[in-house]
Amino acid sequence: MIVTNDQELEGLKKIGRIVALAREEMKRKAEPGMSTKDLDLIGKAVLDEHGAVSAPEKEYDFPGVTCISVNDEVAHGIPSTSKILKAGDLVNIDISAEFGGFYSDTGISFVLGEGEERLHKLCQCAENAFQKGLQQAKAGKRQNQIGRAVYHEARSQGFTVIKTLTGHGIGRSLHEAPNHIMNYYDPFDNALFKNGTVIALEPFISTKAETIVEAGDGWTFKTPDKSMVAQVEHTIVITKDEPIILTKL
């Protein structure tokens, strides 16, 4: 989507704030002994309160309101009453929703409790990589400069990226053009960002793996070698100056 007027921007800001509220409420209430289904219901309550609808449920019939991935699960983890969170788990919450005809997508990874130092470093690297990519998100710049910045930050910290998962355009539907915002440098991607383009920017930073495998449930992606992955995601609007982050409170 390309934002063309203030009404569209306001619509995007509304749904961006809703998913951000849900993300933060889920992170705040996550605790050892809780099932991922219980955590999902916390996100659902926030969406329901504001009249928003889960995007993966609506568009793909996903068996949950939000995606909750734990440890070596990379993305699209199905909320389950049998999946119980433990102290030290690496938890990823990815939540996208629709309100008033506009979509927004956001995600965060965190360690439940103290946990291993390397996992805290991994989460911090994901945040740093997002910020480095964000600096390249300007109208007139090449899309592939985001991937260059993200990958360089990951490697500089001793990590790598999942190359088969990418950011994407968003706005009037969950996935739009540009279809892929790579997390590594693609020399063949010469497209330039247009002013007003709305994208979900989401680095996936890994302790080792660069690819994923399906877990066997038709949805969940995991690493093939038990590597851990942290993701940070925000929906942003590209401008000629600083991008507008729609999913930051």
UniProtKB/Swiss-Prot annotation:
The induction field says: Expressed at very low levels throughout growth.
Q: Which GO terms describe its biological process?
A: proteolysis
Q: Indicate which residues the UniProt annotation says bind substrate.
A: H76, H175
Q: Which GO terms describe its molecular function?
A: initiator methionyl aminopeptidase activity; metal ion binding; metalloaminopeptidase activity
Its recorded reaction(s) are: Release of N-terminal amino acids, preferentially methionine, from peptides and arylamides
EC number, as in UniProt:
3.4.11.18
According to the record, how does the cofactor bind? Binds 2 divalent metal cations per subunit. Has a high-affinity and a low affinity metal-binding site. The true nature of the physiological cofactor is under debate. The enzyme is active with cobalt, zinc, manganese or divalent iron ions. Most likely, methionine aminopeptidases function as mononuclear Fe(2+)-metalloproteases under physiological conditions, and the catalytically relevant metal-binding site has been assigned to the histidine-containing high-affinity site.
Gene3D superfamilies (UniProt xref): Creatinase/methionine aminopeptidase superfamily (3.90.230.10)
Q: Which cofactor does it need?
A: Co(2+); Zn(2+); Mn(2+); Fe(2+)
Where it sits in the cell: the answer is: Cytoplasm
Q: At which positions is a divalent metal cation 1 bound?
A: D94, D105, E233
Q: Which GO terms of the cellular component aspect does the record hold? A: cytoplasm
Main localization (coarse): cytoplasm
Keyword terms of this UniProt record? Aminopeptidase, Cytoplasm, Hydrolase, Metal-binding, Protease
A Pfam family per the record? Peptidase_M24
Residues annotated for a divalent metal cation 2 binding in this entry? D105, H168, E202, E233
Report the CDD domains cross-referenced here.
MetAP1
Cross-referenced SUPFAM superfamilies: Creatinase/aminopeptidase (SSF55920)
Q: How does it assemble?
A: Monomer.
This chain's function reads: Removes the N-terminal methionine from nascent proteins. The N-terminal methionine is often cleaved when the second residue in the primary sequence is small and uncharged (Met-Ala-, Cys, Gly, Pro, Ser, Thr, or Val). Requires deformylation of the N(alpha)-formylated initiator methionine before it can be hydrolyzed.
The entry assigns this protein to a family as follows: Belongs to the peptidase M24A family. Methionine aminopeptidase type 1 subfamily.
State what protein this is by name: Methionine aminopeptidase 2
Source organism per entry reads Bacillus subtilis (strain 168)
